[in-house]
From Swiss-Prot:
Name recorded for this polypeptide: Putative F-box/LRR-repeat protein At3g49150
InterPro entries on file: F-box-like_dom_sf, F-box_AtFBL13-like, F-box_dom, FBD, FBL60-like, LRR_dom_sf, LRR_FXL15/At3g58940/PEG3-like
UniProt superkingdom: Eukaryota
SUPFAM superfamilies registered for this protein in UniProt: F-box domain (SSF81383), L domain-like (SSF52058)
LRR repeats: 101-129, 152-178, 180-205, 228-253, 300-325, 337-362, 406-436, 437-465, 567-590
Residues annotated as domain F-box: 15-63
Keywords in alphabetical order: Leucine-rich repeat, Repeat
Amino acid sequence: MDICCKDIISDHSKKDIISDLPEALICHILSFLPIEDSALTSVLSKKWQHLFAFRPNLEFDDAVVYLNPDGERNETIFENFVDRVLSLQGDYPINKFSLTCRDFTDPTCVSRWISNVMERGVSDLDLRCIVYWDNGTMPPDIFVSKALVHLRIETGNGAFIDVEDVFLPNLKTLYLNKVLLRHSDNGFVKLITSCHVLEDLFIMNICWDGYLKRSLSSKTLKRLTFFCEDVHAVNPESVSFDTPNLVYFVYHDCVADKYKNMNFDSLVYASICLQMTSHQRTHASYEHLVGNATDFLLGISNVQILELFANTIEVLTFCCEQIPVFKNLVCLIIKTDQKAGWESLPVLLKNCPDLESLIFDGLHHNDTIKCEDVDGCLCKSSRGIPSCLSSSPVQFLTIWKFGEICDDYDDMEKQIELVMYFLETMPNLEEMKLFYDTQIYEDVISKLQMDLRRTLSLRSLFNARCYQPSCSGIIQRDDVHEEKPHYGSFLHQRSFSSSMILSQQHMMRSPSHFPLCSPFGVSTYRPMSTSHISGSDESGDVNHVAETLTDLVQQDTVIEVADAAIDSSIQLDFVQQIVHNVHSLTGLNWWASIVFTTFLIRGVTIPLMIECERWFSKRMVIKQCSFVNT
C-alpha cells in the first residue's frame, strides 16, 4: 500500500501540471507579473517561448535597468524589447497599454508603438513620456478613437497636443499633466466638448489659447481635479463652471477677477485652494479688499463636505465681501499654516448651521490684531467667548498633527490652551479626537490628559448637568488616516454624551518600536433627555415622554450636585497642585505622582479621621451621661 502511494506521489512530482493548463489561462497568470519578469519564462520550453507576449495588458517602464555587457545603460535594449513584444502579438486584442520612458527614447519608436496599439483598439492608454517629438507635437491619432475609455498623458517637457480633429466619443477618464493644447480658437473647450460621456477629468499644468478665460461645461462630468497654479501667479480674467452633475471637486487656482455661471447642483465634496497673487498680498488690508470670490463660494454653497486650505482662509478675509451660508455642510476640514490668520473662521462657522464635524489639520495660525477681538479669531480672548463657538452645532472635533511645531512661533502651550478652550466653549461637542506624533514627550501628553480631566469637570459644572465620568484607553492606530464619521448613527440618539479620545498616529510600522504611553481617555454620559419640557417632540413615543418626566424629577438634584461640585473646585485645585509638586520634586511620571499623592493624602487624613471618630464617641458618651443625670 505504501509503495503504491509513493509511486503516485512520484508520478505527480515529475509531471508539469502548469504546462498542461490551457494557454489562455497561462497567459492570464503571466499578466499579473511585470512583463520583464514574465519574459524570463520564454526559456522554459518551446511552448512557453511566446506565451508571455499574449497578454491583454502591456506595461513598459524603462526605469527597469537595461544594461549592456559593460554595465552602461543602453536604451536600445528597451526599444528592441518593446518592438519584439508588439510584433509577437500581431493583431492580438489589447486592453491597456502603459508606457513610461525618459528622454533617451527615440520619438519615432514611441510614435510607432502608439500607432500599433491604437489600430488594435486599445481602451486604456497611459503615456508618461519625456520625449522630444518632431515639431514638439504628439501623434494626432491619439485623440481620434472610438475605443478609448481611459486616457492619461503626462509629459515632462510640455509637449503640444493638436486638438483640431479630436474625437473621443466613449472616453470616460481623462488625465492631462504638462501639456499644451494647440487649436485655432480655444483648445480646452474643443477637447471637452468632443468627449461626450466624460466622467472623470484631471487637469494639471496645462495651457491653451484663452487660458486666462477659463470655462468648463459638461453635463456628464462627475469628478474634477483642476490645478491652475501658475509660476508667476496671474489672476484669471474670468472662471466659469457649468457642471450640474459634479459630485467631487478639487480646485487650486488664483482668485479670478470675475466668476460667472457657477453650476454645482450635485456637489458633495470640495477641496478648495484659492490664493492671492504677490501683488494682492502686498496691498491686502481689512479696510480694502483686493478681490471678490463671493460668487465662487455661492456656487459651491450646497456642498456637504468642504476642505479649505490656509490660502483660502486668507482669501475669505481679504477677497470676499460676504461669506455665504453653507446650509448643507456637515463636515468642514481646515488646513492650517503658521503664516495664515483665522480672521474669517468665526463668520464661516456661523454660516454653517448644520455643521456636525470640524477637522483641523494642525493648529497653526498667524497671530494678528484680530485675535484680541471676540469674533475676530478662534483664540481665547479676555473680552468674551466668540459666538461662533458658544452657539456651535459641532458634535465631533478632530485635530490632526496635534503638537506639530513648524517654527519658533509655534508653541505647544498655545495648542493645549486652544484645545481646552474648544472643549469649554462648544456646547454640543460629543467627541474630540487628537492625533499626535509618537515623538511628542510623554510629560506633554500627561499634562494634556490632566487638563482634559479638569476641563471636562468644569464644563459639567458650568452647564449644571449631572455626569458620570468613566475612563477608557487610548486608541492605538498604525495609520495616520482618519476614518470618516458616520453621521447618521448620531442623529437619532436622545442621550447627551461627551468624550475626548487621544489617538497616536504611529510613524513606524513595527509596534515594538512604539514608546510606552499611559493610556487615558475621558468619556462622560448624561442619562437624561435633551428635549424641551413643553412643546417639543409632541409626536414622540412613550419613551420620549418618560425621558422628559425624568428631567423634571431630577432637575433639583442636578442643581444640588452642581452647587456641591462648584464648592469642591478649590479642593481640586489643591490636589492638582500637590500632584504637580510631587511630579517636579520626585521626577516620577504623572500616573506614579497621582498614586503617590493618593497614598500621601490617605496617610494624613486617616489619623485625623480616627481622632475625629474618637472625639465624636466621647461626645456621645458625655451626652448620654448628661441625659441619665437629668
